[in-house]
Amino acid sequence: MQLKALEVREITDYIKKMMDNDIILRNVRVKGEISNLKYHSTGIYFTLKDEIASLKCVMFNEYGKLLNFTLQDGMSVIVTGRISVYERNGTYQLYAQSIQSDGIGALYFAFNKLKEKLQKEGLFDSDKKKPIPKHPKKIAVVTSPTGAVIRDIITISRRRNPTVDILVVPVLVQGSSAADEICNALRILNKREDIDVIILARGGGSLEEIWPFNEEKVARCIYASRIPVVSAVGHETDFTISDFVADLRAPTPSAAAEIVVPDIKVYQRELFLLKTKLLTLMTAELNRKKKEFEGLKRALYLNSPTKKSEILRHKVENLTASLYNEMLSIYQHKRNDFLILAEKLNSLSPLKVLTRGYTIVLDKQEKVISSVKDIKPYDEIKILFKDGKAKAIVQEVKENE
C-alpha cells in the first residue's frame, strides 16, 4: 500500500503540533553563547551556540522590554522559553520569554568589551573633558525622583548654598527603559540655556541593577552633551562606563553635591579678603604719592635760585594737579569696586531672606533659634520681618516625629 503524499504545510503543521504539545519543549532553559545578534522592530533575533550545536532564537518585544541589560555577541546567557516550528521556512527555534546572564562574568565581559571600544574611540580622553563651573547658578539632577539619593543631594545643596537652583529631572535608573529615559533627559537639558552642570546619579546596587549606566547609548549621550556631566553612580567602589565618559566622576551622589555646589562661606571669605586687599592698595598708593610730593617740596626748598624756584614751582603745580586727578580717579575706581563688593556681600547676608517672605526667630539674648530644642513653652521670643519685628510667647513646642 502506497503512503499518502502530504503537503509541506501539513507535515510542517504536524511537527509544530508535536513540539507545542511536548511537555519538555513547552518550557525549557538553554545555556549558550549569543551570536548573530540583531535588533528588529518586532523583537530580538539571535543564535545560541556551544562548541557543537547552534539554536535560532527570537525574543519578541513583549518580553524584550523586560530585559534589564543589553545583549551582546559573545555573551554567555541562559534563555527560558519554548521550542516551536517557524512554519514559513520549516525551522525550529527557541521563543525566548526571559534571558539572564550566565553568572556575573557575562556582564563583566560586555562591560570590558564596550570599555575597550569606547576607549579606542577617545571617549575617555582627559583633554576632551569639559571643566566643571566653579559658580553654577542652576544644576540639573538626572535621577529617580524618590529615594535617599535625591534627598541627600538637595539637603547638601541647600546647606552649602541655598542660592543655587536645583532642577530634578525624574528618570528610571534601572530596567530596560532606563537607558532611553536617561538619554532623553540629557537631550532635553542640552536644549536649555540656563543649565550650568548636570549630575547623573543613582544609589548602589548589583551590576545588573546599575547596568543602564554601562550601556553604549548612555555613554554616547554623555559624551555628546555640551553641558558638563558629573557621574555619581553607586558606591565609592562601583565603576560604570558613564564614570569614564563623564567630565567628572564623583564617588557617591552626596559627594557630587559637595563637589558641584560651592560653599557660600567661601564666597564671604573671598569678599572679605578682596575688601581688605583693596583698602591696603589704596593706602599704599596714597602714601607713595605723598612721599613723592614731599620729596619735590624739599628739592624746591634746597634749590632757592629764582629760575629753579619758578621751574620747580610749575613742576610742583603740574604734579599736584596730576596727583589730584590721579588720586581722584583711583578713589572713584576703588570706590566703585568697593560698592560692587559690598553689594555682593549684602546679597549673601542671611537677612536678605527676609525680603523673600521668610522670618528670623531670636531668643532673649538675640541669638538665632534654629531648632525646637532651643526653646520651651512660655519662652519669650522675637520675630524679625522684612519691615519690622514682633515679640511672642511660645505656647507649645513639638518636635517632628
Curated annotation (Swiss-Prot):
InterPro entries: Exonuc_VII_L, Exonuc_VII_lsu_C, NA-bd_OB-fold, OB-fold_nuc-bd_dom
Top-level division of the source organism's lineage: Bacteria
Annotated Pfam families: Exonuc_VII_L, tRNA_anti_2
Alphabetical list of SUPFAM superfamilies matching this protein: Nucleic acid-binding proteins
The entry's keywords: Cytoplasm, Exonuclease, Hydrolase, Nuclease
Secretion signal span: none
Gene Ontology BP term (one): DNA catabolic process
Primary localization: cytoplasm
CDD domains: ExoVII_LU_OBF
Enzyme Commission no: 3.1.11.6
Catalysed reactions listed for this entry: Exonucleolytic cleavage in either 5'- to 3'- or 3'- to 5'-direction to yield nucleoside 5'-phosphates
Localization, UniProt: Cytoplasm
Subunit composition and interactions: Heterooligomer composed of large and small subunits.
Name assigned to this protein: Exodeoxyribonuclease 7 large subunit
Gene: xseA
